[in-house]
C-alpha cells in the first residue's frame, strides 16, 4: 500500500493545483442542446471539457463507424478518426463527458503505439483485467472482478464469440488431458478499430455471460482511412523476440464514386513464448530429453495466424448505404507436448515408443450484410439492418506415435535397404553386402553378415514369404527382376541361396498395378492336386516398417446466425435533451462437439511402403493393399462420436436506452434489455453419444432386466437387455427423449446511471446495473457414467446473476483527469459441480456409481477501488508541453459464500471429524476467488514531440503478491492428511507435499511474488509515410510469475503440470525475460 499512498498523494497535489487553475477560468458549462445535424467538418480543436448531452452508458452494440448524415467523401470527424488510426502523437485525448463508469476504450492508435499483438497485450497496461491462461492452447478470454471465461462477455462487431464448455464436470474429465481446444477464440489485433473494456455487470451490451464485465471489439472500416483522399495503402513488418514472431500486414482502402473497399491481410508466424531461462538446456539433445512435468522449458510449438478482413460498401447517396464484410482468421499451433505427463520417461532421447504431436486450430469466419438509412424521420435519425453468419471451430488434434529412426516399429539395426543393380532389385545391409545363412552356426543355423556376426534377431527370417507379399508397382518398377532368398527348393531340399525372379504384373479393381513372384512347385503331387512348394522369401527387417499413429481429432463447433435492427434518435422534449437508442435482434447458435478417433501409419519405411499383403481368406489369397506386408491392418477408424448432444440456442432480444440531459449539470442514463434464451437439444445418429452414457440415466433397467454379460448366460426368468437388444435400444430411446427436454431463460437487464456536473472541474457518476449468464448447454445436458466419476444432467438450472453498484468522482481539466472509483459486485446462483452421492446404475442393482451434478449453489461479493488518471504536463506548465503522466490502480477483495456446507465435503468431514476437526472450519469458511487479480498499479511516463515525429513511453507495472489466504486449492481434500474411503474401504492417507512443504489446508499451492516490470516503447517518424516503432519489455530482466500463469497449473491430468512435491517444472510457467519488439510501417 505504500506505493499506492505515495501515488495518490502525488496525484492529489497535482490535480489540486490543476483544479484551482480551472476554477479560476471562465465557466464553460454552457448548454449544448443545439441541433445535432449540423455539418461535422468544423474545427475539432475545441476544449474537451464542455458538457454534452451524449450517452454515457448506452448499449454499444450499435455501429459507430457510420456517416453522420453527410456524404462519405466529406471531411467529417477528421480529428477523431485520424487519432484512432495514426500511430504517432498522444493516444489518450479523452472527452471526460463521454467517459463511462468502469469503462475503458482502447483505440487502434494506442494498440499500434504499444505494439500489441494479442489479447495479453490488449490488457497489458490495464488494471483489474487479465487474460485466462490455459497453456498450450493460449489465452481463453478474460478475468474481471472475480469471474472469468464464460462469465466475461466477448463480442466482435456485435456478435458473441464462442464460449468454452464450462461444465466443471467436463473440465474434470477432459480438459486436463489436452484432448480438447476448450478456449474462447481471439481476434487479430491489426483488425481492431476500438476495444471497449467494461468492468462490472454488462448484460445490457453483451447479453448472457457478462457477469463480471465485457470486452467488445469493433473492426476497422474503409471510411476510417479515406478521410480526405480516395485511397490508402499501408505495409507493416514487425518482429518480437519473446516468440520469434514475424508480422506482415497489408492494408488497402479505396473509394471510387459510390463504392469503397477495405482489405487487411495479416500473417503472424512464430513459436512458443520463451519463458525465463529459456536456454536452460545446453543443446537440442538435452532439450528433447527433458520431458514430463519436470521440464523447465516451454514446449516447442510453431504458431501461425492468418487473418483477412474485407469490407465492401456501396453508397448511392447520402441517405442509403449497403455493405458486406468478410472476417476470416485461422490460428494454428503445431508442436510436441514434451511436458506431457504420460510420456515414457525411460525412452527420452533414445525414443522407442513415441511422443505426442499436436496440431490445434482455431478458425473463425464471419460474413455480414448490412443496410443503413440516414434519412431523418419522427422515429429515427439512423437505422441499420444487418445479417451475420459466423462459424467458429476450435480443433485439438493429437498424434501419438514414434517418428525417430530408433522407434521399435521401424527398427533396422543392420541398415537393410533396397538397391537396383542392372535391372534387378536387391536387399543389402548397411555395407552394401548380402546376408548369408550358415546352417552350421548355433543350434539350427543362423543368418550372418559379412563379418560372420549373428543377425537373426534383426531380420524377419520366418515371414516375407513370396506368396504372402505383393509389390506395389506404383512405387517400384515391376519390369525389373527381384533377388529373393530361397531356403528350400520345390523338391524340399536345402538351398540357402539368392535367386533373381521375374515380377508378374497384375491389376487391382481400382486400376492400380501390383506385382507378384510365384513360388515354384514340384512335379510330383503330395496328394490330390497339392504339390510341394519351395520356401522362398524377402529378407525384410524384423520390425513392421511403420509406427502406429493414434489420432484424436476433436472439434468444438459454434455456428451463429443473427439478424439485427438498430435505431437511434435525438430529440428535445420540454426542456430536456434525449439521445435514444433502441432495437432488437434474433440469434440462433448451434453448439456441437465431434470426436474422431482413428489409427493410421506414420514414419513409414521402405519395406512397409513398397509392399503389401496377399491375404489368405477361406483358403484363397487376395490382394489387400490396406494391409501391411505382414498382413496387419494399417489404418483403423473408430468412427465419430460425441460426449455432448448438439444444442441449438435461440435468443430473442429487445433493448431500449435513453440518455436524458435534464439540465446543464444533471443527466440520467436509462437503459433496459430483455433476453429470451431457448435451448433446443437434438440428436445426430451420424455422430452418436456412446449408448452407455444414456441408457439407465433417468429410466432405470428393471430388477429382472439382464444387462451385463453375454446374452447366452442370461438366467431363464430374466429379460435380455444386453447391448443392442430390443430392450436395451428401448431404454436408450426412452432416456434420450427425457434428456432432450427444451429449456428456456428470460432476463430483464438494466443499466441506470446518474451524471452530475456541479462544476466545470468535477464530475460525479453513479451506476447501478445487472447481468446474467444462462447455463451453457454442456452444464445442462452433459452426461457421463464411470465407476469413479459420473455426471447427471440438470435441466432445472437457474441463470447466474450479478449486480453492480459503482460511484466515480472525476477531477479534470482539458485532457487531464483523475477518476476515483469504488464498486461492489454481487453474484448469485453460481453454477458448480456438486457431488450428489452414489446412485444405482439400474433399479434394484447393488452397483452404485458416485454421481455429480451441476447445481446453483454459490453466491459471491467483490468490493474494490480503482484509480485512473492522466496528467498532460502542458496543462500546468507551458514548457512541459508534450509530457504526460499516467497512473492506474486496482484493489479488490472477494469471497464465495455457501448457503450451507458444500455437499462435497460431507463424507470427507464425517470420516475425519475425530482426528482432524480443524477441517470443518476450513470447509465452512468463505472460499477465496482465484479469478481476482492481486493489487496492481501501472505508472506511465511519456513524451510526444510537438511535431509528432517522435515520442517515447515508459510503463512501470507493479503487482503485489497473491496472498495465501486469498487463494484456493480445489483439490485440498485429496492432498491433506486424511482418512478416505476407496471402493467402500476406509484407509488412512498421508498428506501430499507441495514444493517441499506438507499440504495442511485449502490455500493455493502456487502463487506469485510481488514484482515490478518496466517497459519502454518509442516511435520515430522521419518522413510522413514512414514510422518506426521499437520497445524493450521487461527492461530489468526481472524473473517473475504472473498470478494467472500460477493458477493455470494443474494438480490432476497430463498437461500444465509440475512435479508437485518438489516444484520442478515451475520455471516453464515464468514470464519472458528481457525481450524486444520492433516494427516499420509504410503508408501512402
UniProtKB/Swiss-Prot annotation:
Spans annotated as Disordered: 26-77
Annotated Gene Ontology cellular component terms: cell outer membrane
Gene Ontology process terms (BP): siderophore transmembrane transport
Annotated Low complexity bias: 26-75
Motif TonB C-terminal box positions after renumbering to this chain: 1067-1084
Keyword Transmembrane: yes
Main location group: membrane
Sequence repeat windows: 26-29, 30-33, 34-37, 38-41, 42-45, 46-49, 50-53, 54-57, 58-61, 62-65, 66-69, 70-73
Motif mapping: TonB box: 83-90
InterPro entries in alphabetical order: Plug_dom, Plug_dom_sf, PT, TonB-dep_rcpt-like, TonB-dep_rcpt_b-brl, TonB_rcpt_b-brl_sf, TonB_rcpt_CS
Membrane topology, as annotated: Multi-pass membrane protein
Region (12 X 4 AA tandem repeats of Q-P-T-N): 26-73
Positions of the TBDR plug domain: 95-220
TBDR beta-barrel domain ranges (all copies): 228-1084
Keyword annotations: Cell outer membrane, Membrane, Receptor, Repeat, Signal, TonB box, Transmembrane, Transmembrane beta strand, Transport
Keyword field contains Transport: yes
Range of residues in the leader sequence: 1-24
Subcellular compartments: Cell outer membrane
Entry's Gene Ontology molecular function annotations: siderophore uptake transmembrane transporter activity
Family (UniProt): Belongs to the TonB-dependent receptor family. Hemoglobin/haptoglobin binding protein subfamily.
Function: Acts as a receptor for hemoglobin or the hemoglobin/haptoglobin complex of the human host and is required for heme uptake.
Miscellaneous comment as given in the Swiss-Prot or TrEMBL entry: This protein is subject to phase-variable expression associated with alteration in the length of the CCAA repeat region. This mechanism is called slipped-strand mispairing. Addition or loss of CCAA repeat units would change the reading frame and result in introduction of stop codons downstream of the repeat region. This may be a mechanism of regulation and a way to avoid the immunological response of the host.
Name by which UniProt lists this protein: Probable hemoglobin and hemoglobin-haptoglobin-binding protein 3
